[in-house]
Amino acid sequence: MTKIAFTGGGTVGHVSVNLSLIPIAQERGYEAFYVGSKNGIEREMIESQLPGIQYFPISSGKLRRYISVENIKDVFKVLKGVLDARKVLKKQKPDLLFSKGGFVSVPVVIAARSLNIPVVIHESDITPGLANKISLKFAKKIYTTFEDTLKYLPKEKADFVGATVRDDLKEGNRTNGFQLTGFNDDKKVLLVMGGSLGSKKINELIRQNLDTLLKEYQIIHLTGRGLLDETIQREGYKQFEFVTDELTDLLAITDTVVSRAGANAIYEFLTLNIPMLLIPLGLDQSRGDQIDNAKNFQNKGYAETLPEDQANTTNFIESLHKIESNRSDIEKQMHEYHQLFTKEDLLDKILKDTNQKETRES
């Protein structure tokens, strides 16, 4: 029986594909387990959403692109992580490792390669992240969400597979969504989210412009943990720090999204045909991957993009008005999008590329 190790973490985007694939593997009778950090968001997500999956925590260090004393400490954390992961993999004896990236994945990938366990990695953003650039040296294959990513990768290792979204995405219940928020059908619903960690900039934009926004929208505001402002109590405005199971119900009542531009999130909005205003993380906070993602979606007619350093009241409100003016054209473009690989197809490809015998075709 095929046994699959999964890894990836640090953000929701580095876990979501794994959350889609693991249940498919289980349905086929394969064994699966997860290797992640001790306190990362991946542990919380896996243990809460897939309680039957064994989770093995390892030491992990952050990968930084800038000079810092912390880099020296983290070298030792990564080395310990390799030893931790090697111990887990040696005992569990998986047939392959699937890595979704993020800093925690690097020691697991290195450990797998040292034990001759075939590795497949997945890159969601247009430009490969640092963790996947390192992991690529040890992997048999790297799969990409964006076709444009292929130009940054070796041809013999890279395959374009498109986005993989979770099963329950389209199962949201509008009645539940309205009950959760106290909203109704009388006015459009604007969903605001700043990524898994929240965004102070987006939160400020919304709160500063509530009077204007509430004239046109009912607002669901996902603020990020610890970023609620309980002093703001307005009709048509509902705050949550973070949601998991309830998100599909909230998306079911959403007409427009204001969001960061993480690849997994924006492909979920695309799958649901929800027009979006994307405010990507700036170069002062990231390597620019979200900027590239947002530009790609704007060029395809799926979204409007507002750079964070230009995100003032005037530009923000104008961008939302532009979406409403062009809503029919945006939705038309979105309806033409088709998923390239289903989750079942992707799992088959992983098994085939790592020379496993058990696939649907066999």
Swiss-Prot record:
Pathway linked to the protein: Cell wall biogenesis; peptidoglycan biosynthesis
Membrane topology note: Peripheral membrane protein
Location of this chain's protein in the cell: Cell membrane
EC number: 2.4.1.227
Keywords: Cell cycle, Cell division, Cell membrane, Cell shape, Cell wall biogenesis/degradation, Glycosyltransferase, Membrane, Peptidoglycan synthesis, Transferase
UniProt-recorded name of the protein: UDP-N-acetylglucosamine--N-acetylmuramyl-(pentapeptide) pyrophosphoryl-undecaprenol N-acetylglucosamine transferase
Catalytic activity field: Mur2Ac(oyl-L-Ala-gamma-D-Glu-L-Lys-D-Ala-D-Ala)-di-trans,octa-cis-undecaprenyl diphosphate + UDP-N-acetyl-alpha-D-glucosamine = beta-D-GlcNAc-(1->4)-Mur2Ac(oyl-L-Ala-gamma-D-Glu-L-Lys-D-Ala-D-Ala)-di-trans,octa-cis-undecaprenyl diphosphate + UDP + H(+)
Superkingdom of this protein's organism: Bacteria
The UniProt record lists the keyword Transferase: yes
SUPFAM superfamilies for the chain: UDP-Glycosyltransferase/glycogen phosphorylase (SSF53756)
BP-aspect Gene Ontology terms: carbohydrate metabolic process; cell division; cell wall organization; lipid glycosylation; peptidoglycan biosynthetic process; regulation of cell shape
Binding site for UDP-N-acetyl-alpha-D-glucosamine: R166, S196, Q290
Keyword Oxidoreductase: no
Protein's gene: murG
Species assigned in the record: Staphylococcus carnosus (strain TM300)
GO molecular function, a single term: undecaprenyldiphospho-muramoylpentapeptide beta-N-acetylglucosaminyltransferase activity
InterPro entries associated with the record: GlcNAc_MurG, Glyco_trans_28_C, GlycoTrans_28_N
Primary localization class, coarse: membrane
Function: Cell wall formation. Catalyzes the transfer of a GlcNAc subunit on undecaprenyl-pyrophosphoryl-MurNAc-pentapeptide (lipid intermediate I) to form undecaprenyl-pyrophosphoryl-MurNAc-(pentapeptide)GlcNAc (lipid intermediate II).
One GO location term (cellular component): plasma membrane
Family note: Belongs to the glycosyltransferase 28 family. MurG subfamily.
